[in-house]
């Protein structure tokens, strides 16, 4: 990626972690349709590989603003996709895709991090991977830890996530009939792919 700074990429990962970790509340729903968010999306679209995914997400948000009971409908989508059985869902856990659920724990230890007691989900939840990537990008921007060490850990995290993210995204696209979380997951997929190629 060429136009986004490490801090901006960190912010995108943190934002996505938040949206995949729990249902949107009224404040978040208002925020994603705000002018400030439109500016943020414009910035993301300045990165050519992200443009199509951001456009898709913006279209879903525009449709969302005229959807009756939008928050309740999105909550139902979230629950159906991420909290039910895996038969017609996209469970946001590495272990649901036959991946080593201990890998993220090792990566967190290597980064000097641990999961928060406030987050009542297993450590292999998608949001944990995204929070770790956010932390690593912020650390790259600060320059307090050698960049080579952070970059190595970032690549390991991206590789571990890439083992199951495409299948997760495919399931989001298959089972999210409204399309908000499908569009969000597509943006994440493209972001991770770009980040992974930016060695």
Swiss-Prot record:
Q: Which HAMAP family match?
A: TorD
Which GO terms are recorded in the biological process aspect for this UniProt protein?
A: protein complex oligomerization; protein folding
Domain of life from the UniProt record: Bacteria
Entry-linked InterPro entries: Chaperone_TorD, DMSO/NO3_reduct_chaperone, HscB_C_sf, TorD-like_sf, TorD/DmsD_chaperones
Spell out the NCBIfam families in the cross-references. PRK04976.1
Q: Which PANTHER family match?
A: CHAPERONE PROTEIN TORD, CHAPERONE PROTEIN YCDY
The listed locations are: Cytoplasm
The UniProt entry's sequence similarity note says: Belongs to the TorD/DmsD family. TorD subfamily.
Quick one: a GO cellular component term?
cytoplasm
Summary of the function given for this chain in its UniProt record:
Involved in the biogenesis of TorA. Acts on TorA before the insertion of the molybdenum cofactor and, as a result, probably favors a conformation of the apoenzyme that is competent for acquiring the cofactor.
Q: What is this protein called?
A: Chaperone protein TorD
Sorted keywords for this record are: Chaperone, Cytoplasm
């Amino acid at each position: 990626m060429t136009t986004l700074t490490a801090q901006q990429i960190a912010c995108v990962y943190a934002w996505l972690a938040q949206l995949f970790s729990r249902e949107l509340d009224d404040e978040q729903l208002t925020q994603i349709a705000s002018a400030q968010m439109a500016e943020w999306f414009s910035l993301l679209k300045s990165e050519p590989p992200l443009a199509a995914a951001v456009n898709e997400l913006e279209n879903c948000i525009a449709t969302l603003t005229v959807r009756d009971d939008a928050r309740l409908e999105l909550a139902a989508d979230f629950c159906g996709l991420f909290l039910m059985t895996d038969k017609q869902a996209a469970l946001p856990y590495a272990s649901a895709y036959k991946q080593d659920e201990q890998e993220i724990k090792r990566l967190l230890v290597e980064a000097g991090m641990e999961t928060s007691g406030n987050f009542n989900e297993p450590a292999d939840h998608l949001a944990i991977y995204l929070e770790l990537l956010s932390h690593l990008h912020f650390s790259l921007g600060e320059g307090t830890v050698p960049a080579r060490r952070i970059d190595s850990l970032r690549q390991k995290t991206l590789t571990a996530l890439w083992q199951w993210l495409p299948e997760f995204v495919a399931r989001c696209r298959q089972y999210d009939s409204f399309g908000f979380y499908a569009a969000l997951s597509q943006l994440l997929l493209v972001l991770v792919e770009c980040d992974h190629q930016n060695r």
